[in-house]
């Protein structure tokens, strides 16, 4: 998948809008490490798996090429599609030559060749026709009476997505262990938390980290809500991927708790937002997307567009999610009754159409967080990254006390030469922890279903999922999905 399947980068007023519009190229500037201005010749080998996707390939290549610390490194592009891979390779080589950049680059359809000597591996794959399979994940369970809001990462749709994509990712990781066992593997593919949890259970020696940029909503929204620059705030968020909330927020100047102000002021902000359709209308009329306050003054607004579950979390749980309903609502049994279904469908149709028309290009600017993390490792910087996906018990201590050690959580982490070290968040508020705990058995059974190629365990993963409120028809639904997606799910016995 052209990654960023992790969702869609958040920006301007609507997280989903910014990710699609900017092709997931919005930089998340949180506690960003300094960019070194003197050349440090690292000569690292950085492998991009899934690089035939122009969105992922061009964006990540640009991220690497803008980094002074990594000058002298060799970039290896790998994809199973030789035609798209060749286009990305030729474009990248021409860009490097045009700008006289101190990097080398090659491409290969042979994964083992690509991984030979790798220091860092960045994975962003999808299998089959992304949108055709996604629509099956979403719509077929609905035909059997399952009420799911999106079908990408949670609920039955998230299960089938996971059952398809995890086996090839395990194959990639097995090759990493055999060929370049010391390499760091960074994953952008979804369903993030199920992928990462399964990899760490099946191949615990792999240095596997999941990255998602939904955290990028906070620098976009909180300054507008609180009236202060994001740099004036000390914010930490955590939970599971696409299922995280702001846990603490303080003003740096005096240490005051900013959450009371968030709870007071956020409803007026999110209750008067432009929908994606209205922003797209503005784009068609003006030729540009609204970004500044004066732009949004000309865009019609509505109440909580694609943020009705978000609204319940803020008003009833006192917590602000870092993403919108199409992600957060996938994991909650009551979300279907609350969510803005039209907003979700509008986003999906826009996103699908936009990706078919967008023409990505290489730019020398930072768009994602993987390169700062790599830079933090190679320079032993010790900076804090705002959101990574790592095992809850990594480094011998729990990040979130009221979740099990083995599940992969999303949390801040410090980055140094030894790797990524999760920042302890303690006990999460019990209400939010209860929602997260509902996913524990789902993730465990998903991992075991893949590892043991077990249809019975896949069925159990459905039966313990809070999105599933019925037994009747469930086995027929599972068998229907296996039949429709037999090239990818036929291994389930």
Enumerate the predicted regions with their spans.
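N-terminal Rossmann-like dinucleotide-binding module
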Residues: 46-71
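Internal, well-ordered domain-core segments that constitute the primary functional module
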Residues: 171-255
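NAD(P)-binding Rossmann-fold cofactor-contacting core
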Residues: 71-91
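Short, positively charged and aromatic/hydrophobic N-terminal segments
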Residues: 13, 25, 29-34, 38
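Cysteine-centered motifs
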Residues: 6-9, 41
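Long, compositionally biased stretches enriched for glycine and/or charged residues
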Residues: 227-493
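Glycine/Thr-rich phosphate-binding loops of Rossmann-like dinucleotide-binding domains
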Residues: 56, 131-132, 196
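Rossmann-like NAD(P)-binding element
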Residues: 80-84, 101-182
């Amino acid at each position: 998948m052209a990654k960023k399947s992790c969702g869609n980068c958040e920006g301007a007023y609507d997280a989903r809008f910014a990710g699609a519009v900017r092709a997931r190229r919005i930089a998340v500037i949180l506690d960003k490490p300094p960019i070194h201005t003197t050349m440090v010749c690292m000569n690292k080998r950085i492998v991009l798996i899934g690089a035939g996707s122009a969105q992922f390939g061009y964006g990540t290549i640009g991220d690497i090429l803008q980094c002074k610390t990594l000058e002298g490194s060799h970039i290896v592009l790998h994809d199973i599609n030789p035609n798209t891979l060749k286009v990305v390779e030729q474009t990248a080589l021409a860009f490097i030559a045009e700008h006289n950049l101190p990097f080398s680059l090659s491409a290969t359809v042979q994964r083992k060749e690509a991984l030979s000597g790798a220091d860092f591996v960045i994975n962003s794959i999808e299998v089959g026709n992304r949108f055709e399979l996604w629509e099956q994940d979403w719509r077929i369970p609905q035909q059997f009476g399952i009420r799911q809001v999106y079908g990408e990462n949670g609920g039955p749709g998230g299960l089938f997505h996971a059952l398809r994509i995890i086996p090839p990712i395990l194959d990639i990781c097995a090759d990493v262990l055999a060929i370049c066992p010391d390499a760091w593997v960074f994953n952008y593919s979804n369903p993030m938390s199920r992928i990462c949890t399964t990899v760490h259970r099946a191949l615990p020696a792999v240095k596997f980290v999941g990255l998602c940029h939904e955290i990028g909503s906070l620098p976009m929204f909180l300054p507008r809500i609180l009236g202060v620059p994001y740099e004036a705030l000390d914010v930490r968020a955590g939970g599971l991927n696409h299922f995280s909330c702001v846990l603490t927020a303080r003003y740096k100047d005096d240490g005051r708790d900013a959450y009371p102000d968030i709870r007071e002021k956020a409803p007026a902000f999110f209750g008067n937002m432009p929908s994606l359709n209205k922003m797209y209308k503005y784009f068609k009329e003006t030729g540009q997307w609204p970004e500044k306050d004066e732009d949004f003054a000309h865009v019609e607004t509505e109440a909580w567009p694609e943020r009705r579950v978000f609204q319940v979390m803020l008003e009833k749980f006192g917590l602000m999610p870092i993403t919108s309903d199409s992600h957060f609502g996938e994991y909650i049994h009551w979300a279907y009754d609350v969510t803005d279904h039209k907003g979700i469908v509008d986003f999906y149709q826009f996103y699908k159409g936009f990706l078919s028309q967008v023409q990505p290009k290489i730019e020398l600017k930072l768009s994602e967080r993987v390169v700062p993390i790599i830079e933090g490792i190679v320079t032993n910087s010790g900076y804090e990254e705002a959101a990574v996906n790592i095992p809850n018990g990594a480094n011998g201590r729990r990040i979130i006390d009221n979740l099990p050690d083995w599940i992969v959580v999303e949390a801040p982490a410090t980055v140094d030469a030894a790797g990524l070290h999760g920042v302890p968040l303690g006990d999460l508020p019990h209400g939010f922890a209860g929602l997260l705990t509902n996913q524990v058995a789902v993730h465990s059974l998903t991992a075991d279903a893949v590892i043991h190629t077990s249809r019975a365990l896949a069925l159990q993963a459905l039966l313990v999922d809070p999105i599933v409120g019925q037994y009747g028809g469930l086995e027929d639904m599972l068998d229907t999905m296996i039949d429709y997606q037999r090239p990818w799910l036929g291994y389930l016995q």
